[in-house]
């Protein structure tokens, strides 16, 4: 590891530790409906609290565009953080200035304070030097535990690391270690599964992966675009016909790099997209003109699972079919269960991420069996695309 972690933080009793966390959680009727992101950062907060630090939490919530917006106040999140930490969490009505400074001054060692939404100030997203200085005035040490915001060069995710001694929190550390195993320095063969609806949202990802993995499984609606580019009639299936040349270029790049491309050989088709819709399995070259492919078929599942069996490392982003609606979840569930079984047996390093992917693995009831499941969304995708992550790079540069 080329960055400092909490293992390097000793003798911090009484020190003001600014901790960047991800509290951008879903809220309905004033209640947090999914506490996963809070649970992920809880170990870092607890550890710093137990070491006697004055723990000061920095976070954003929503997109208030640099102005205070009542509905986007972090005050509504404080009680959910309290519940998960099982300790009092104080709240300050601003993240800089007197309100923040006074609240921090009143903290006892080991206590936790949540500052107001950093995005209530325009300087946050601009990474403005005056705003960074104002944030830094409230801390002695900076800990970044928000990998999910690491692809943004904002004041609280990147700027602060230039002003204070900077460390990776436990979530950041776990994420980076898992990603290093996934694509940084993986055990081979490496197989990637990329699914989801559209090729257009994952062009950079596919172009990067074909240079790094031994086999690329393409599923979901995006597989139709590749099949159509090869002359297959995909009927009424979701398909970006205008990206045929892009698909061909990715296939050519894969061939040149020695990366096997695994496309469906059969599909589960239906005339309507609803639960329990009449459906049939057809050869991929015999899709009825009035039907749409909503999942890959049993022969394709067999081929995908064979690749998973050969793999030492699996990187997964996106479902293989319309998993939200039965019976079009079969391929995703079958592949997920097979990958989970090999991971449990110690034969596979499995790293997965992206919103739909997490939901799909939870649906298959195997998320806990994967080596690592990232909740980071955009940052996970940009890492898979081979793009720099400012919030990570600055931790490496500083140490």
UniProtKB/Swiss-Prot annotation:
Its main location: cytoplasm. One of its GO terms (molecular function) is ATP binding. Pfam families: PGK. PROSITE patterns: PGLYCERATE_KINASE. Pathway: Carbohydrate degradation; glycolysis; pyruvate from D-glyceraldehyde 3-phosphate: step 2/5. ATP binds at residues 202, 324, 354-357. Its EC number is 2.7.2.3. Transmembrane segments: none annotated. Keywords: ATP-binding, Cytoplasm, Glycolysis, Kinase, Nucleotide-binding, Transferase. GO terms for biological process: gluconeogenesis; glycolytic process. GO terms for cellular component: cytosol. It is an enzyme of class 2 (transferase). Disulfide bonds: none annotated. It is found in: Cytoplasm. Substrate binds at residues 22-24, 37, 60-63, 119, 152. It catalyses: (2R)-3-phosphoglycerate + ATP = (2R)-3-phospho-glyceroyl phosphate + ADP. InterPro entries: Phosphoglycerate_kinase, Phosphoglycerate_kinase_CS, Phosphoglycerate_kinase_N, Phosphoglycerate_kinase_sf. HAMAP family: Phosphoglyc_kinase. Belongs to the phosphoglycerate kinase family. Monomer. This is Phosphoglycerate kinase. The gene is pgk.
């Amino acid at each position: 590891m080329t960055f400092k972690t909490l293992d390097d933080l000793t003798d911090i009793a009484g020190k003001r530790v600014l901790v960047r966390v991800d509290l951008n959680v879903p809220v309905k009727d004033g209640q947090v409906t999914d506490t996963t992101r809070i649970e992920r950062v809880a170990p870092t907060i607890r550890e710093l609290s137990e070491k006697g630090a004055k723990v000061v939490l920095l976070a954003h919530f929503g997109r208030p565009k640099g102005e205070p917006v009542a509905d986007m106040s972090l005050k509504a999140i404080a009680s959910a953080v309290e519940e998960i930490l099982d300790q009092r969490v104080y709240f300050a009505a601003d993240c800089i200035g007197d309100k923040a400074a006074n609240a921090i001054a009143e903290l006892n060692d080991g206590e936790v304070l949540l500052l107001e939404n950093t995005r209530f100030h325009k300087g946050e997203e601009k990474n403005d030097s005056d705003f960074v200085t104002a944030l830094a005035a409230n801390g002695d040490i900076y800990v970044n535990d928000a990998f999910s915001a690491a692809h943004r060069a904002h004041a609280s995710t990147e700027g602060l690391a230039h002003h204070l001694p900077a460390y990776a929190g436990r979530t950041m550390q776990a994420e980076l270690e898992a990603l290093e195993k996934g694509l940084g320095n993986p055990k081979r063969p490496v197989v990637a599964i990329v699914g989801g609806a559209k090729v257009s949202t994952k062009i950079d990802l596919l172009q990067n992966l074909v240079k790094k993995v031994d086999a690329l499984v393409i599923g979901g609606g995006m597989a139709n675009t590749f099949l159509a580019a090869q002359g297959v009639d995909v009927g009424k299936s979701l398909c970006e016909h205008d990206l045929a040349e892009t698909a061909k270029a990715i296939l050519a790049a894969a061939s040149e790099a020695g990366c096997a491309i695994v496309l469906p050989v059969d599909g589960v088709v239906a005339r309507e997209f609803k639960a329990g819709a009449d459906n049939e399995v057809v050869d991929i070259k015999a899709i009825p003109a009035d039907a749409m492919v909503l999942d890959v078929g049993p022969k394709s599942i067999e081929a995908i699972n064979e690749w998973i069996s050969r793999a030492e490392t699996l990187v997964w982003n996106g479902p293989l079919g319309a998993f939200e609606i039965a019976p079009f979840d079969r391929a995703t569930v079958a592949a997920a269960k097979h990958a989970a079984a090999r991971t449990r047996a110690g034969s596979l390093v499995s790293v997965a991420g992206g919103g739909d992917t997490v939901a799909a693995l939870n649906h298959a009831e195997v998320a806990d069996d994967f080596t690592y499941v990232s909740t980071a969304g955009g940052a996970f995708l940009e890492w898979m695309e081979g793009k720099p992550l400012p919030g990570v790079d600055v931790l490496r540069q500083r140490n």
